[in-house]
Curated annotation (Swiss-Prot):
Species annotation: Listeria monocytogenes serotype 4b (strain F2365)
Family: Belongs to the TmcAL family.
Role noted for this protein: Catalyzes the formation of N(4)-acetylcytidine (ac(4)C) at the wobble position of elongator tRNA(Met), using acetate and ATP as substrates. First activates an acetate ion to form acetyladenylate (Ac-AMP) and then transfers the acetyl group to tRNA to form ac(4)C34.
SUPFAM superfamilies from the UniProt entry: Nucleotidylyl transferase
Residues noted as binding ATP in the record, renumbered to the chain: 7-20, 101, 162, 187
Reaction catalysis annotation: cytidine(34) in elongator tRNA(Met) + acetate + ATP = N(4)-acetylcytidine(34) in elongator tRNA(Met) + AMP + diphosphate
The protein's name: tRNA(Met) cytidine acetate ligase
Gene3D superfamilies: HUPs
UniProt lineage: Bacteria, Bacillati, Bacillota, Bacilli, Bacillales
GO CC, any one term: cytoplasm
A Pfam family per the record: HIGH_NTase1
Length: 390
């Protein structure tokens, strides 16, 4: 069976995702499409708008054959680690092709850029450090400056959000298994972070979340496939944002000592002190970010750091594993054919997982379900089995 892998958040699953999924299957001639999906919290450092099990249902209803959870310790980090670990899982599960959307739209250029970085790794790392020192800027900007300086302006624009992820997928594939084929299609209509829905059928997930959180579910339905609309209408829980977790973060920052927070993943350069001061003044999470931000810390980095503090995520990360959130019959058939040759632990029943392997994931789910209205999902990792569809 020819397998294509995609890396997703489906926050929520919308028409753009449906287009991407259909193209992945069509252009790669895949027998099975496997999605590695973020769980309770996503890469921008915020809670998913609805639980991972509902988003898994959306994925399966739209045609994904298997949904594998990207562990929270990787799903909530910067693009390098996010991509490395997603590719590690897809490689372990033996996909032939990694398919992604990008602003650039030419897969060969991503591969070429990745090869150049791998072949010039020492020079590239040195250029990043020089940019950090000389310009006192964020790591992301220093990375971009170093890339432009060494490889020119025209190879690949890694200031674009989907190009960044695509580049890091390509880089991870070069380092882990260069035989993985890369394919990409240009993103259509909506930009990744566009906050307004300006097209008849395609809008960014950001714009769709904005509509849903404003109570405009029916208006958002223009941008969602019928299967997603049905799941959203039947969902009885709340639609979530940082608003639902601000008081928990505020308490955590106020009660913790500065030295205690130094050991949290992503905390550096004394940023915890600014965060603790802001926590006593801010009225909400948006205020908190405004009071905390500096030239060296982008909003996304601040959100990720705040999330690691909320989750009490220590500097070490968990070991990778393959945790199945859901499958259809094709996905089940594929897993049955390949499971003996998969090197990572395969988890379908959480209670049978190796001791300690899921500790961070379980804690993240428990914190996520503290939000009012999620009582039915509490301890869901134990009582909600993988979703199996016909």
């Amino acid at each position: 069976m020819k397998a294509t892998g995609i890396v997703v958040e489906y926050n929520p699953f919308h028409n753009g995702h449906k287009l991407h999924l259909n193209k992945a299957r069509e252009l790669t001639q895949a027998d099975v499409v496997i999605a590695v999906m973020s769980g309770s919290f996503v890469q921008r450092g915020e809670p998913a708008i609805l639980p991972k099990w509902e988003r898994t249902r959306m994925a399966l209803a739209a045609g994904v054959d298997m949904v594998v959870e990207l562990p929270v310790s990787f799903a909530t980090q910067h693009a390098t680690i996010f991509a490395e670990e997603a590719v590690r899982i897809l490689d372990a599960i033996h996909v032939d092709t990694l398919f992604f959307g990008s602003e650039h739209g030419v897969a060969e250029d991503f591969t070429l850029a990745a090869k150049k970085v791998v072949d010039n790794e020492a020079r590239f790392d040195e250029a990043i450090q020089l940019a950090l020192v000389d310009k006192k800027t964020s790591y992301a900007r220093a990375y971009t400056e170093a890339f432009k300086k060494l490889f020119g302006q025209n190879l690949l624009d890694i200031t674009k959000p989907n190009n960044i992820l695509g580049f890091h997928y390509a880089l991870a594939a070069q380092k882990q298994n260069p035989s993985i084929s890369l394919q990409t299609i240009p993103r259509e209509h909506a930009g990744y972070h566009d906050e307004e829905a300006n097209h008849d059928q395609i809008a960014s997930a950001t714009a769709i979340r904005k509509l849903i959180l404003a109570g405009k579910l029916e208006e958002s339905s223009h941008y969602l496939p019928a299967s997603s609309i049905a799941i959203l209408r039947n969902y009885e829980g709340p639609f979530l944002s940082w608003t639902d977790y601000w008081s928990f973060l505020q308490y955590r920052l106020i009660q913790a000592g500065s030295e205690e927070l130094e050991g949290i993943r992503g905390v550096s350069e004394g940023i915890q002190n600014r965060m603790q001061q802001a926590a006593t003044k801010a009225q909400n999470f948006s205020d908190f970010i405004e009071l905390t931000k500096t030239k060296r810390y982008s909003n996304a980095r601040l959100q990720r750091t705040a999330l690691q503090i909320l989750l009490n995520a220590r500097s070490q990360t968990s070991s990778p594993y393959i945790r199945i959130l859901g499958m259809n019959k094709t996905g089940q058939q594929y897993l049955s054919l390949h499971k003996k040759n998969i090197s990572l632990p395969i988890i379908t029943t959480v209670s049978k997982a190796p001791a300690g392997l899921l500790e961070e994931e379980l804690r993240a789910t428990n914190i996520y379900t503290l939000a009012k209205g999620l009582e039915n999902y509490q301890a869901g990792d134990f009582h909600i089995p993988p979703i199996l569809t016909l």
